[in-house]
């Protein structure tokens, strides 16, 4: 009985220990996580059985943005309240990766860093603090950085204290995978090294491994590397053979694999650097890549005699190694160097090194050069109707390439820190500074590429919108010029033109919102241009609508439809203006080529500007009535200007008919010189307030109010003074007037009597008489 009870208690304790110790994941066997490997279907953790499963839809592959990762977490875990994501601290080995269109696969194994899907309110991780270790934390409320930044901060802090980073976790979330602090545990070097198994320490003794095969040829591991590479190659061959067998069984899948998109092949190729499998390189290619690298001393200043393979000479040559960083063309002895690189033909090495090699100690992934650059490919391809889809693909490839480069740099950083453990503190700081500069340069390069991508996309969208608007306006004018004009055809052309103008306005506002979020200073500079463009749209639409009055018969017949159209557009303008500040986050992938606002409900925000705002400035027209058109018995229509009175100086060629109308004349609108300086907009409390432009008409009322205010203030002051004076005069203490001719003794006696003094003699005689 007792052994059975002990087994039950042990099983219950084991299940309890497997549960994730977070409030949001209470009762779950595993923590919600997702993993991505470009070219393969995404994987997610089954929280009920703790196993990795493929994408349920069978279509989702690697995601390029943090917003997309959060959305995918919410899709695969609909029963959980996923509020944020964070990159995991440690990589995991996941099997059974599948390509698109396959539900079950085997022998596909990759090592990746997953993303944790955080449930409910954020709760910091519970870190274990071993003996002789210290728990530390850092918070900065003015900083909102990624998981990678805070990991670097924790490592630097522990390194300054001559300790190793044992574990860490994020604090104070401020965005998607962004935080304001970090908690971490630093352990002494001796304690950390004792707690790690010696076999594991030879492979990787750092706290975080960023994936990838960390091959060190300088440590005499040639046989191990070649053996591992051969095993991987055999596994890949078997994997491809198994897939070929499956393809033979299903002819449709053969066609699908043969017609695999170029983009998917590119993503699969560029993901090699983040895994431990060599899916496209043979052992010879790996060795050729190593032996073709130039000798790198590294950022440290040690003088260690090493050997490297010289491509031009075809033999190994000595050089001095600094002790950290560098590359893999680094061998202890000449014999070992020749054993690795001597078997590779010099012609293949010269072919590999025909292009200039980077001089930087941090070697970026070489697989990116095998495919065209994502941004360059997008920029070289002319725009078409699928501009938005091409832009989204280019953006995802750019983010994937940036993540790949950052992962490679972090692996190099880890390797350099392992090698620099026994070096002086100055050398350690030099290593940290070098890689910090490298990370910053990669971030800046990615930011420049993003900006170039966005600017090109915006320019193409604007050109396409201009073409659409021009074509719609020409069709509208042609319909008006038809003999006889068909009212319903005219209305359809007018509706298309209005939609084209609406797209232009939507594109302008979204572009300004993106610039405002990325670069507020630049947004302030282009603010007047944005307002001017909105004003141009307003003027252009008023002129186009005024043309309808030249054909009164058509205007009268379609008046109801036009009024309804104008009301819808006015409601659209009100919705846009009312929601300008309600949702400030807009990805730079949204643009005017996406579905209209009535379908997507995307909101924008305008910065407050100096000056006055008129609601009509963003409402492109005013409703009109055909009854206001005067009758003309001679069929000569006097056009009615539907624009505001202040803007009626623009000529519309009254009475000239529509035979000589040109689209360019409508598109070119004269703007007031003052509008560039005073944009005429003001936002208060998320509402738009109209101020009359003609302030002179209210000067009389203002002067009257000022005079009345002065009079009222004067009366109040006089009243207060009188009340104060009355208060002081009403207070008295029974003062009795004394004749000025009396003697000083009598005056003194009078004052004493006023204060209650009684002459004792008088009091004695009064008592005697009584």
Curated annotation (Swiss-Prot):
Residue ranges for the region (Disordered) are 196-283
Instruction: Please tell me where Zn(2+) 1 binds in this chain.
Output: 183, 186-187
Q: Which residues carry this modification: Phosphoserine?
A: 198, 206, 441, 730
Task: Specify which residues bind heparin according to the UniProt entry for this protein.
Answer: 96-110
Zinc-binding: annotated span: 181-188
Record site feature (Required for Cu(2+) reduction), residues: 170
Glycyl lysine isopeptide (Lys-Gly) (interchain with G-Cter in ubiquitin), cross-linked positions: 763
Positions carrying Phosphotyrosine: 497, 757
Site residues (Susceptible to oxidation), renumbered to this chain: 706
Further notes on this entry?
A: Chelation of metal ions, notably copper, iron and zinc, can induce histidine-bridging between amyloid-beta molecules resulting in amyloid-beta-metal aggregates. Rat and mouse amyloid-beta peptides have an arginine residue substituted for the bridging histidine residue and are thus less capable of forming amyloid aggregates. Extracellular zinc-binding increases binding of heparin to APP and inhibits collagen-binding.
Domain topic, free-text comment = The transmembrane helix undergoes a conformation change and unravels partially when bound to PSEN1, facilitating cleavage by PSEN1. The basolateral sorting signal (BaSS) is required for sorting of membrane proteins to the basolateral surface of epithelial cells.
Q: What is this protein called?
A: Amyloid-beta precursor protein
Originating organism: Rattus norvegicus (Rat)
